[in-house]
Amino acid sequence: MLEKLIKNFVAYMGVASELEFDADGSYVFPISSLVRMRVRQNADEEIIISAFLGEIPASMDIEKAYARMMEGNLFGQETGGAALGLDSDGHAVLVRRVPGEVSQEDFASYIESVLNYAEAWLEDLGLSKTEQE
């Protein structure tokens, strides 16, 4: 089901490139030059949408950045129901879990929502000025 959702979404977006996979088998979405998005299904059949925001530079006030992320996470009010966090390499990520059985329209809405919030958080945290992986 996930593969079909992704292929339909990529076709809808007009992305001509082949779908890529990363080391953990996640689909890598080539839909934004600022945000690297990944989509996979977990063992509970939920769809996990993640947006890589980048490394918080050492020149930033790390405690202030972390506090801002925690404020944004409160009740999902500034994340659209997603969660901000750090991956094992210390990079900021935005992650959203959605039901595995989702319509094509809802899937597209979830992807667009995560992308929009991710781009807003890039700006909020000042990461849009740093180089993304």
From Swiss-Prot:
GO terms (BP aspect): protein secretion by the type III secretion system
Family annotation (CDD domains): T3SC_I-like
Coiled-coil region(s): none
InterPro entries: Tir_chaperone
Family designation: Belongs to the chlamydial CPn_0713/CT_663/TC_0034 family.
The name this protein goes by in its record: Uncharacterized protein CT_663
